[in-house]
Curated annotation (Swiss-Prot):
GO BP term, pick one: protein N-linked glycosylation
Topology in membrane: Single-pass membrane protein
Enzyme Commission number(s) of this protein: 2.4.1.153
Name of the protein: UDP-N-acetylglucosamine--dolichyl-phosphate N-acetylglucosaminyltransferase
Amino acid sequence: MADKLIYLIIPAYNEEKMIKNVVNNLQNHNYDNIIIVDDGSKDNTYKIMKELEEESKQNNNNNNNNNNNKVIAIKHEQNKGVGGATITGLKKAYELGADIAVTFDADGQHAPDDIAKVIQPIINDSKEYVVGSRIKNPKEFKNMPLTKKVGNLGLSFITFLLGGYYVTDSQSGLRAFSKSALKVLSEQLRAKRYETCSEALIIAKKNKLNIGEVPIKTIYTEYSMARGTNVMIGFKIFYRLLMLKMGKVLD
């Protein structure tokens, strides 16, 4: 991985409680190129992001390193949704010349150790787009709340019916993209909200990107459970995907 320029992309909305811990944990695992997109937060998320960015700059100056190992804080003045924040992050990673980009949730539910799992198939030149699946991990699937099991499997099937690749965990926030996939998705993604995960799979199939899945684990806490998708969001994703299919992009 040493010769690959890898960027982590973290969409964040009102994540003042977790964002510093999440970024520091990634840095402790030697993932230092991190793009955080604040999606119009109303708390201190962006303030903390700027502090992390400044710390990164100071570390670079102390090590005479002006190019890499950096935290980049980007702010949306108005909330655009997780899809909008993801698109901003993907475009920035592509602009910076990333060989691989990885999306990573801001609520602490992902384990940094799993990043290597989603990256490896791309490094091996076998895949262009890799989804980290909680459902392919038998232990994780057993521990997953029933509503999440039904919702994830249902949305994965709906995504397939609407023209996307079938993957077991279509709503996973931990995904890796090669440079070619990064270019395609940064140019073609339109979805602004949670339906962005499904739209990415539809675009990937349309462009014949080579896709794969790897099992990952999930760190379930009261905090992450409260911030994930629920039944109502699942219905909204379905509706918004139908609108996309008809050529209508909803805010």
